[in-house]
A protein has these predicted regions:
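Extracytoplasmic/secreted cell-surface and envelope-processing proteins
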Residues: 192, 461-463
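Short periplasmic/luminal acceptor-recognition loop of GT-C membrane glycosyltransferases, typified by
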Residues: 372-461, 475-481, 485-487
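Transmembrane alpha-helical segments
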Residues: 349, 357-380
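Short secondary-structure junctions
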Residues: 465-477
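Membrane-integral, polyisoprenol-dependent glycosyltransferases
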Residues: 2-351, 355-356, 375, 415, ...
Length: 493
């Protein structure tokens, strides 16, 4: 019996053990690492504020300031999980692990249609890609966004395959509902893969009628799910319309003000590295497939016309990628929705490989990812809010009601560990940002025991501010790179 034939039996049972293995793969070690600032701490803090206030419509970072830079779906997911399973890092990250696991299953479902000879292979590739696996263990909007974009792509692929049967309409409606939820997860970026799929649908309009992808019930679900929250909060606060359209959409697209790799080579530096490292251990097959295509540019128009699968994957990947490259705000996780079609491309690229060779590469990738997870859990990084919370809890105060960061970025994840309010104060009397109230006016307010944290560069200015503003203060120690002060009264004595 050949080695490859010996390996076929486990492959035939792939779908039987996929779900338990996938759940173990996605959920294991989720709680071993503390929350990292800024993203994880902020998302969890806003979710906790929803649970505390009961206001699930308007996100807040504390009881004073709203935080509407992102739509609320991620906050809702984290808040629901923490409410159900308790205040633990595992519970906070559970929605993302679940979204990752479901994305793997959806990629596998598309594999049945697009890689029928080995439908399990795209799921295996996606599960062992570096970027989706790493992102599933970091609380941001991107893993949920990738799940919903993959969901609507899978629904439209299935509808196309069933276009001659009655079941296609249900998949189309489900696809539009998923597109609405993608928009509720992150706004306009959630529709970029949809634009690529729309280009593909237009390209085959003579073969598959464009009405296949239209559904009145689906479009209604898309509008209600995708735009309902935006319309509701804008009705109460009309100036949010300009904020959403100008600050959060147009300025991020066209302006370098977000300081996220907006320079000329930022796209190459960020996205080039993300695609090369994020697709490990399948990078080489993808590069070889790309090289083979580029060596014969004259054959590309023929392939575009003759191969619907290649056309679908090209539209799905290239249309969003062009927008991401042109936009002036660039981060690695932005490309996460493109890794589902990349998994399908990689599965085709290794189509001639033996099952044993595929399994060995996937196993090597899995071992590398587990090692990366273990490293992240064992090494305490400066942005670890759990470590900082332990240092603050050891300070000589009877209780902690609020932690205020003076002239430095707040660590909102402390709210998760200390059950205290977290805010940012400014030493300027007229600070530029609404979420930075002046320390001179805030510190005298008796809001329980407030610990003031300041870095060395601003410590002297804070002491001067306190001396003239409240007359007295007390240094109570250090926590990480911060020096801690309190003022008399408020329960800190």
């Amino acid at each position: 019996m050949t080695p490859d034939r010996q390996f076929r039996s486990p492959v035939r049972h792939f779908w039987r053990w996929l779900i338990p293995a996938l759940l173990l793969w996605a959920f294991a070690l989720q709680g071993t690492r503390g929350l990292w600032s800024p993203d994880e701490g902020r998302y969890v803090d806003v979710a906790l504020e929803m649970l505390k206030s009961g206001d699930w419509l308007r996100p807040h970072v504390n009881d004073e300031f709203a935080h509407v830079t992102k739509p609320p779906l991620t906050y809702w997911a984290v808040a629901s999980s923490v409410e159900l399973f308790g205040r633990h890092e595992w519970a906070a990250r559970l929605p993302h692990a679940l979204a990752f696991a479901l994305s793997v299953l959806l990629v596998g479902a598309m594999g049945r249609r697009l890689v029928p000879e080995r439908p399990w292979l795209p799921a295996l590739v996606y599960a062992t890609f570096v970027l989706p696996y790493v992102a599933a263990h970091v609380i941001t909007t991107d893993t949920l966004l990738a799940f919903f974009t993959t969901a609507y792509a899978a629904a439209f692929v299935e509808a196309r395959a069933r276009r001659d049967s009655r079941g296609a309409g249900g998949y189309v409606a489900a696809g539009w509902a998923a597109a609405g939820l993608a928009f509720l997860a992150k706004g306009p970026p959630g529709l970029l893969p949809l634009a690529g799929l729309a280009l593909f649908a237009w390209s085959e309009r003579r073969i598959v009628g464009p009405t296949l992808y239209l559904s009145w019930s689906g479009l209604l679900l898309f509008v209600v799910l995708g735009f309902g929250w935006y319309l509701r909060v804008a009705f109460d606060q009309p100036d949010l319309v300009r904020y959403f359209l100008v600050d959060e959409f147009w300025n991020r697209l066209s302006s370098p003000q977000s300081h996220r790799n907006a320079d000329a080579i930022g796209a190459v530096r960020v996205y080039g590295g993300t695609l090369l490292l994020g697709t490990l251990p399948w990078t080489w097959p993808l590069l070889r497939d790309l090289s083979r295509s580029l060596r014969r540019p004259s054959a590309l128009p023929l392939a575009w016309r003759a191969d619907p699968l290649s056309r679908l994957l090209a539209c799905w990947i290239l249309v969003p990628l062009v927008v991401f490259v042109l936009a002036r705000s660039r981060l690695p996780f932005y490309l996460l929705p493109l890794f589902a079609p990349l998994a399908l491309v990689a599965a085709r690229a290794v189509g001639a490989w033996s099952n044993r060779r595929v399994a060995l590469l996937a196993l090597a990738g899995a071992i590398g990812l587990l090692a990366l997870r273990a490293f992240g859990a064992l090494v305490v990084r400066p942005e670890d809010d759990r470590a900082l919370a332990r240092a603050i809890a050891a300070l000589p105060v009877p209780r902690i009601d609020e932690v205020a960061f003076v002239n430095t970025a707040p660590r909102y994840g402390l709210a998760f560990y200390l059950d205290a309010e977290v805010e940012r104060l400014s030493l300027d009397d007229d600070p530029p940002a609404a979420q930075r109230p002046p320390a001179r006016g805030e510190v005298p307010l008796r809001e329980g025991c407030r610990i003031l944290l300041v870095e060395a560069r601003s410590a002297a200015a804070l002491r001067s501010n306190l001396a003239t503003g409240v007359g007295s203060y007390r240094r109570i120690g250090a926590a990480g790179r911060y020096t801690a002060y309190v003022v008399p009264g408020g329960g800190c004595d």
